[in-house]
A protein has these predicted regions:
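Core catalytic alpha/beta fold that binds nucleotide/phospho-ligands
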Residues: 1-218
Length: 218
């Protein structure tokens, strides 16, 4: 389903559980050598998905190490994003001629634990979430907001190389259109010669998972 919220011309792969054929390169093994089995399984299958997507793109499908703040290190000439949560793993990759930066995030379609919304949402976002929960209760809008902010960060970091706090972007959802706009309160993002004050995102809630994406087109 991830292909429904990313641009045409990108390549994706996804899995709804850990795959027995998924393996890691020795360099990747070092990243999760101390991880619990659940985390290791998610990481391994997510890397497997990433290599599937890279192969479809015609790019080298070797080890994908982690760089600053855990961001995946893609082969030269590739931009992409990886996500994994309970019951879902996915990756998307693209060529820089099409996409400057992209972020995806998956979360279980469940309400956030008590207190988390207060920690991640601005006051007006909290009001909007409560209104959306009342009008469209089948979507866990609090969890969707959290996911969307993760996607915003994943698209922001490769451009700016610095952390973006949750309060650094204000999100506005279109519940009917499956889209959202992120207003960059922490300052604009610089994408080549462009100065971006907003990011555009897409979302869906399906099969017990909420998915979000943010794409900065080339």
């Amino acid at each position: 389903v991830i292909e429904r919220i990313v641009p045409a011309g990108t390549e994706t792969a996804e899995a709804y559980g850990d795959l027995p054929e998924a393996t890691l390169f020795p360099e990747e093994e070092l990243i999760v050598k101390s991880a619990v089995a659940k985390r290791r399984g998610e990481f391994t299958t997510a890397r497997h998905c990433a290599r599937q997507a890279l192969t479809r793109l015609g790019a080298p499908a070797g080890a994908i190490l982690t760089g600053e703040r855990g961001a995946p290190q893609w082969p030269e000439g590739v931009v992409g994003s990886i996500t994994h949560c309970d019951g879902y793993r996915a990756a998307v990759v693209a060529r820089p001629a099409l996409v400057t930066s992209i972020g995806i995030d998956a979360e279980p379609a469940l309400p956030l634990p008590s207190g988390v919304l207060d920690a991640v949402a601005l006051a007006d976002e909290q009001v909007a979430v409560k209104e959306l929960l009342a009008s469209v209760p089948q979507v866990p809008w609090d969890r969707l907001l959290f996911s969307a902010k993760e996607s915003v960060y994943k698209a922001w970091f490769p451009l700016m190389r610095r952390f973006l706090e949750f309060e650094g972007a204000r999100l506005v959802f279109d519940p009917a259109g499956g889209t959202f706009t992120a207003h960059l309160l922490a300052g604009p993002a610089i994408a080549g010669s462009r100065t971006l004050h907003t990011f555009d995102g897409r979302w869906l809630s399906e099969n017990g998972i909420v998915l979000t994406s943010v794409t900065v087109p080339a």
